Amino acid sequence: MIYQGKSLSAQLLEDGIVEFKFDAQGSVNKFDQATFEEYIAVVAAINNCSEAKGVIVTSGKSTFIVGADITEFLVSFSQPEDALASWAKKASDVFDSFEDIQLPTIAAINGIALGGGCEMTLACDYRVAATTASIGLPEVKLGLMPGFGGTVRLPRLIGFDNAATWMSTGKAFKPAAALAQGAIDAVVEPENLQAAAISMLKLAIDGKLDWRAKRQPKLEALKLSPTELIMSSTTCKGMIAAKAGKHYPAPMVMINTLIASANLDRTGAMAAENTGFAKLAKTDAATAQIGLFMADQVIKGKAKKASKLATKAVNKAAVLGAGIMGGGIAYQSAYKGTPIIMKDINDQALDLGLTTATGILTKQVERGRMNAKKMAGVLNNITPSLSYDSVKDVDIVVEAVVENPKVKGMVLAEVEGVIGEDAILTSNTSTISIDLLAQSVKRPQNFCGMHFFNPVNKMPLVEVIRGKDTSDETVAAVVAYAAKMGKSPIVVNDCPGFYVNRVLFPYFAGFSQLVLEGADFTAIDKVMEKQFGWPMGPAYLLDVVGVDTADHCTGVMSSGFPTRMKKIDNDPVSTLYANERLGQKNGKGFYDHIKDKRGRPMKVPAPVAYELLGQHCADKKDFSSEEIIARMMIPMVNEVVRCLEEGVVDTAAEADMGLIYGVGFPPFRGGAIRYLETLGLDNFIAMADKYTDLGEIYHVTDGLREMAKSGKSYFTTDVKLA
């Protein structure tokens, strides 16, 4: 052993081969400050070992290296930009020092090699991957770019265009694809990885492979003519501008860095990377996207903990109500491996549910993501039934019948009489109080809400709603089942609208007030989509949700919060609903939903909608983009703050992820609380105070004012003030 640290070691094997092993004390290998310090020591030990003839880099984990420890490096990100660039240089210098070892080097990639893990392999002369490995540079998903030499080495290995694609998409590549592009040199079965890597390394040691020639291009400028560089850069920039847009700066900064460093040697190119990395790390988008990554880890961590605490395992499920929603729930459960009974009262409904599941699966097969055998296996996990007897042995029931408290209560009471006493009963409801529904069951401790979002197979969020009598064991089991289904569960306490709908409808109220004052709904949509970043503006979103559904939810929210969310007179949503303009579901809402010449769906502003709304709205008035954004977002942010203060949702991280996963809040803004803190609490309060005459939804809470006064952050403070 020539070096032994807590995470890294270097051992001299036979024939002068040094095994440089990453084997951290935790579950995965990642780059943190302690690992960097050991990395420097390993390089020194190898350089001082006179018997060393070559180096193989290995992992003692099932993964290779998952990347950098972003939680630790966030402290460095708080530095000024020039200091951050210096920090990035120190980190990338460590990789350079390894690459400069005057011995052949090879990486034996046994599993995931992402971010810094991928960059570790790029610093080697050769790369051999197991068939189970994956490799990529996903930093763009955090609003960042590679910072350990990825922008320098990858384009010199696989070419400008391929490297631009790798980095701007953040995609992880399977070994075969990486091999075809030249990112790795061989692919072998996992059991042969070590032997294959050592065999290739010996060829390099013996001079049968020219490792110096293999390394040299990574130290020089790219082999591109001026014309080739112009063509490649123009194409890449055009594609990125179209896909990423103005709100996500990382892809364009990466491409500009590649362009700037194309004619530079490693030293110059590294300096360009250090500068670009520091620039991106200081952007609001990076702060937001890193925050989302960490929030997602919070949710996953809670789900993992729930899985360990759950005393009731869910091995068989049932869904009551086989409509589109029931079919989607059945598909998701079956697809992720939990057999499910799909029960309804008539064959037509069962056919609809099966058609929904089959349609989702067929698309998977058509896109090459699933074969026919897998599709058949998933369908075999779904058992349609007209009888309650079929569900008597299930571990969990998801009731998904019509959104009517009387109907739901009746169905819940019926099925509770059939299932086992320790079976869990849940209701997929978007608005009906769980405590109200619990009055229909005899074992309320085994009952909670399980709010899926449509379409179930695409929307990640599930709200697990705790009633006043719901047991911790029930919550843990349902969270574990949702996670098993591949969903991101967030536990919320029962209240009107739960969490997502409760904070969404004040946003819709802001929209309705603007329209009544003369704003054009298409202008509002344009501002909220193009400038704020929502995937759909409020009018379009209402059409997609369903104008009838939105009108119903507005009534629920009005009953629950009669002062703050009282029904708006001549609400545009109610006006359209009264005239049977239900949105996308019947082809007419704020927009007319038609098909273009190629048969693709499209929307056009509906003249009839303008006519109907004009009967109650003020004359047309133009509002500035700033005012539209303020009047739309203040009510939502205020309601999220109230939910945190009341303990409806536990943490700011979960509050933000609920909006990202549930309604498509722009990820580059990081969620409502991240948006609030990016604006600055004092600035938000000053903005909201301008609109207090518009109603209580624009009034900030005393708790928010106290947070601003004390300079606290919602991400580091217990905010349950109510």
From Swiss-Prot:
Site (described: Important for catalytic activity): 119, 139
Keyword hit for Isomerase: yes
Active site: 451 (for 3-hydroxyacyl-coa dehydrogenase activity)
Pathway in which this enzyme or protein is active: Lipid metabolism; fatty acid beta-oxidation
Family statement drawn from the similarity comment of this UniProt entry: In the N-terminal section; belongs to the enoyl-CoA hydratase/isomerase family. In the C-terminal section; belongs to the 3-hydroxyacyl-CoA dehydrogenase family.
Entry keyword set: Fatty acid metabolism, Isomerase, Lipid degradation, Lipid metabolism, Lyase, Multifunctional enzyme, NAD, Oxidoreductase
Source organism per UniProt: Colwellia psychrerythraea (strain 34H / ATCC BAA-681) (Vibrio psychroerythus)
Quaternary structure and interacting proteins, as annotated: Heterotetramer of two alpha chains (FadB) and two beta chains (FadA).
GO CC, one annotated term: fatty acid beta-oxidation multienzyme complex
Top-level taxon of the source organism: Bacteria
Name of encoding gene: fadB
InterPro entries according to UniProt: 3-OHacyl-CoA_DH_CS, 3-OHacyl-CoA_DH_NAD-bd, 3HC_DH_C, 6-PGluconate_DH-like_C_sf, ClpP/crotonase-like_dom_sf, Enoyl-CoA_hyd/isom_CS, Enoyl-CoA_hydra/iso, FA_oxidation_alpha_subunit
Annotated binding of NAD(+), by residue: 325, 344, 401-403, 408, 430, 454
Residues the record lists as binding substrate: 296, 501, 661
Region of interest: 3-hydroxyacyl-CoA dehydrogenase: 311-722
Reaction catalysis annotation: a (3S)-3-hydroxyacyl-CoA + NAD(+) = a 3-oxoacyl-CoA + NADH + H(+); a (3S)-3-hydroxyacyl-CoA = a (2E)-enoyl-CoA + H2O; a 4-saturated-(3S)-3-hydroxyacyl-CoA = a (3E)-enoyl-CoA + H2O; (3S)-3-hydroxybutanoyl-CoA = (3R)-3-hydroxybutanoyl-CoA
E.C. code: 4.2.1.17, 5.1.2.3, 5.3.3.8, 1.1.1.35
Name of the featured protein: Fatty acid oxidation complex subunit alpha
Pfam families per the UniProt record, alphabetical: 3HCDH (PF00725), 3HCDH_N (PF02737), ECH_1 (PF00378)
A biological-process GO annotation: fatty acid beta-oxidation
